């Protein structure tokens, strides 16, 4: 019963987060290049990066779940009971979490299908300020694989990018400050191990890595950047290129045109990495030999802007290669499609942000219009306030996601540092002291005597301090009071009194 309560309280919060996708026929967990590599034998193509096995016959006979990329299957643990029975495999459809947008369009008189797909990893899940950095296995928070697909006359092009939290041991716990300072954990050796394992895995999966780090190079973020730069230099992986760009400093005072500095710096390597291109009859013409791995502190707002710019430049190259655009033509000049491109990338930014923070992305006015606007700044302010509230007053419940009237279970969950997302995707790790010094969150279904006594006492002596309604009210009191003060302050300014003194007194009263 206790276990049932934990899951019933946590799973709806996970499932209500947009969006989950599945397909009856397509391998949506794979990029086109990865799918092509698994379907056929291309052992030599990606050396020394990808060590694909030649298993085309085995691949063709497997179900969608069996041949899926397990990093992106969010219902993998739920489908395990079906895996033992071959006749049930057709019902075991892998589900991804992220973003999908399929858009027929016309460019220069040619019909194309432009698709954007993002897949969130299940290997280090959690909410914004509660799950940061990497773990001992090299898995990082908010890791998302984004693929841009272009289909023209039977030919298909694919361009893949990734994002993920800074691969070091660090955290940024909410403390009621608007921007809690990130803090490094562990020693230099642990940071090196986390970075090394993460990057080795990324090189194996995607090829050469260009780490585009957009965090501030001063202050608290600057300490993270300095440590990451030092660790990257120490590890000295020949297949990893580190590219730091202080987004806020370079683009201060709304000088967003200065992003061209970064784009010029990475232009050559983007051309060298190329993209995947497959002809109508199935033969490939090009393969992507590396990816851009972009991050900021959240891997959201700044990351979205840069990824959309890299995607636009790739789209330009693809359309010219497929003879949709002539050499003198630009994607930006295709007015209708350019509007579609900007809006889809902005919608993508919002969705990835909602999944990690609970609000839409910041700076999407630049993605939608190509420039920063005053209305965009106001919208960023509104979303920042919502983020502040959710990070400090709501995400803790989502992270722990247990009934507030079971205090000893709350303690057990906190001790084991597990959340509803980890339980949902099957990532719960048993600690050596679990069940000894503290109760396991995956304890047997039989409730112990403490729980039975607790329920009996609650039924005869309801305690207001332990009721969910009272707990929610207690946590809602501070933000509601703040909102009331702000509302009254706004009203006082909007409806002035006859005397200036009365206005000032009203402002001082409600602001205080």
Describe the function of each predicted region.
Residues 290-309:
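A phosphate-binding catalytic loop at a beta-strand-loop-alpha-helix junction
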Residues 1-285, 314-512:
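Phosphoinositide system proteins, centered on phosphoinositide phosphatases
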């Amino acid at each position: 019963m206790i276990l049932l309560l934990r899951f019933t309280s946590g799973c709806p919060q996970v499932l209500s987060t947009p969006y989950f996708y599945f397909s009856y026929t397509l391998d949506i967990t794979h990029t086109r290049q990865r799918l092509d590599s698994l379907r056929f034998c291309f052992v030599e193509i990606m050396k020394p990066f990808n060590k694909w096995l030649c298993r085309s016959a085995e691949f063709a006979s497997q179900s969608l779940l069996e041949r899926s990329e397990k990093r992106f299957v969010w219902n993998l643990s739920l489908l395990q009971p079906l895996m033992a029975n071959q006749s049930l495999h057709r019902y075991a459809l892998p589900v991804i979490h992220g973003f999908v947008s399929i858009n027929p369009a016309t460019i220069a008189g040619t019909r194309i299908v432009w698709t954007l797909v993002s897949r969130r990893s299940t290997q280090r899940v959690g909410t914004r300020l509660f799950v940061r950095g990497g773990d001992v296995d090299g898995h990082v928070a908010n890791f998302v694989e984004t693929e841009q697909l272009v289909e023209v006359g039977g030919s298909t092009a694919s361009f893949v990018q990734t994002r993920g939290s800074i691969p070091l041991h660090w955290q940024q716990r909410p403390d009621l400050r608007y921007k809690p300072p990130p803090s490094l954990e562990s020693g230099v050796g642990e940071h090196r191990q986390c970075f090394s394992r993460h990057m080795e895995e990324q090189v194996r999966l995607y090829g050469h890595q260009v780490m585009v780090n957009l965090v501030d190079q001063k202050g608290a973020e600057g300490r993270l950047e300095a440590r990451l730069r030092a660790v990257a230099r120490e590890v000295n992986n020949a297949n990893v290129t580190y590219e730091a760009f202080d987004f806020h400093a370079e683009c201060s005072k709304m000088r967003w045109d200065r992003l061209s500095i970064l784009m010029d710096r990475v232009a050559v390597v983007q051309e060298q990495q190329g993209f995947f291109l497959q002809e109508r009859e199935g033969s490939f013409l090009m393969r992507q030999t590396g990816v851009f791995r972009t991050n900021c502190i959240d891997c959201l707002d700044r990351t979205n802007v840069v990824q959309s710019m890299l995607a636009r430049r790739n789209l330009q190259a693809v359309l010219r290669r497929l003879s949709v655009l002539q050499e003198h033509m630009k994607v930006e000049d295709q007015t209708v499609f350019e509007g579609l491109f900007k809006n889809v990338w902005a919608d993508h930014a919002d969705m990835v942000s909602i999944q990690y923070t609970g609000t839409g992305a910041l700076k999407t006015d630049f993605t939608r219009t190509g420039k920063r606007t005053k209305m965009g700044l106001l919208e960023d302010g509104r979303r920042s306030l919502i983020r502040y509230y959710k990070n400090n007053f709501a995400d803790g419940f989502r992270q722990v996601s247990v009934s507030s009237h079971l205090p000893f279970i709350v303690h057990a969950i906190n001790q084991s540092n597990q959340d509803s997302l980890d339980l949902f995707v099957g990532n719960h790790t048993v600690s050596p002291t679990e069940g000894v010094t503290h109760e396991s969150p995956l304890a047997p279904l039989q409730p112990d005597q403490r729980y039975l006594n607790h329920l009996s006492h609650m039924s005869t002596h309801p305690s207001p301090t332990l009721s969910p309604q009272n707990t929610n009210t207690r946590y809602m009191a501070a933000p509601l009071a703040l909102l009331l003060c702000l509302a009254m302050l706004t009203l006082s300014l909007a409806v002035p009194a006859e005397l200036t003194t009365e206005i000032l007194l009203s402002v001082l009263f409600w602001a205080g």
